[in-house]
Design a protein with these regions (language model features):
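Short linear sequence motif anchored by a di-proline
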Residues: 1-192
Length: 192
């Protein structure tokens, strides 16, 4: 699971990293919590979106989706084909349960100042018919060095796969599994 992440980069860094053509809205920085508005990347655009899907049938926000099942689940399968996004983050946080305590860890990669978290987004309309963008973060089984902290982690899209993730109409579960299983990042965790 990914329940919080960190944004400590400058917006101009996103323009360079993702070769953006345009941006829309403003967003939060610092430690990000579900429901907050953050910049996400959709093709060549940065769009401010709220973290978490609000569905009438769910009594809580859906902030994560298991990457292993997004092409099977009714909630996600159409979004997985056409509404993929990247959530730029500097790090993410997980809590390790030890006895009756929870220890907070900041997890990051020294070689990447901005991690590209894989996400899905959808557009809905509020009661006044205003357009609202919302996203969820894809998760996978945690990498070996992270498993002792938490059994899940965000899917990170590496630079070589960014364009395919954002633009391709041919991503299916097999291709997503390849992207997930061929990550070359090396994560570090620090107690906060």
């Amino acid at each position: 699971m990914c329940g919080r992440f960190l944004i400590d980069y400058e917006f101009r860094d996103l323009i360079d990293k993702y070769n953006l053509a345009k941006y829309q809205g403003s967003a939060n920085r610092g430690e990000i919590f579900p429901s907050q508005k953050v910049m996400t990347i959709v093709q060549k655009y940065a769009i401010a979106m709220d973290w978490g899907f609000d569905f009438k049938w769910s009594n809580k926000k859906i902030i994560n989706a298991r990457a292993e099942t997004i092409f099977e689940k009714k909630t996600f399968k159409n979004l997985a084909r056409s509404k993929r996004c990247i959530i730029p983050a500097s790090a993410y946080f997980e809590w390790q349960k030890k006895d009756d305590q929870k220890i907070k860890y900041k997890i990051f990669d020294h070689s990447e100042s901005i991690l590209s978290l894989a996400g899905l987004y959808h557009i809905r309309f509020d009661d006044e018919n205003n357009k609202m963008y919302q996203f969820t973060i894809l998760t996978k089984e945690a990498e070996e060095g992270i498993r002792n902290i938490h059994n899940r982690m965000p899917v990170i899209i590496e630079k070589d796969n960014t364009e395919e993730w954002l633009f391709s109409e041919k991503i299916d579960q097999l291709r997503l599994n390849d992207i997930i299983n061929n990550q070359k990042l090396s994560f570090e965790a620090k107690i906060q």
